[in-house]
Amino acid sequence: MRVDPGPLEGLTGAAVVQTWHLDLISAAVIALLASAYASCYRRGRDGERPVEPAQAGCFGVGMVLWVLATLSFIGSYAYVLFWVRALQVLMLLYVVPFFLTQGKPVTVVRAALGPAGRDRVDRLLASRWARVLAHPLTTSLAMLATPWLLYLTPWYTAALESEWIGAPTRFLLVVVGFGYFYARLQSDLVPRRYSQLISLLISVGETLGDGVLGLVIWQGSLIATSYYAGIHRSWGPDPRLDQTIGAGVLWILGDVVGLPFVLLLMRALSRDEKAHAVVVDAELDTAAAAESETAVPSALWWENDPQLRDRFRRG
């Protein structure tokens, strides 16, 4: 199914407000996931409170941003301007999944199930392949590789030209981003919890990787030249400037939207360190108590008897 961007005019303020994109697949997926989360949240709230309302609100914010990234002017102009496409990729890969994970969907779904369903979820989380897929290193590699593969292979042009590739690509971006934040933040139920120090170390390497990709797109050859030339766009920036702006969106704006993630990582690391300190203090107190009970008195045996102690002292 070939995509027809239509006779879009220049990207003005009026176009931002008035332009909407018909993306039935994204609309169906968003409606299905939002309905499922809302249903599970209501069912879980009747028995216990799995998540706070603010956390559920974060999931709703993620859904709204997903709508904006696919059904608003971004969804339309992503087929015409390179930098708008970069903005869409950034939102689907980073921003939308970040808010979705804050809603703790795994916890919400588990709380809505019965005892048998919860056991199945627990067994699934305890499986070996779940620990491998949800490992911080695995999800970080997928997060780092996806933009490189998208922009530096024919995948980018194919996703623009065919909706059979474009629709799964948009969904895949959200899935990869969700797995990344799910494994790194560990705010939801996860197969295994790792030290947040690992995530901070991984973030250093990711910053370098994102920066190099931005430089490659900025200084490298033009991407999808035949596709953009075939649109015959007579307004807006030229192809080189368009791609330069897109590189800035992916690089600079990507670092800006990543600041809340880093702050949450540091907060989680501080929380883990405090919990570890409590455990260590408890172990030290237990060891000290055991030593005091089994310790041999350093004084002579008769010094523990008041009468003998006074007699020997007078003598």
Please provide the spans of the model-predicted regions:
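Alpha-helical membrane segments of multi-pass proteins
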Residues: 1-315
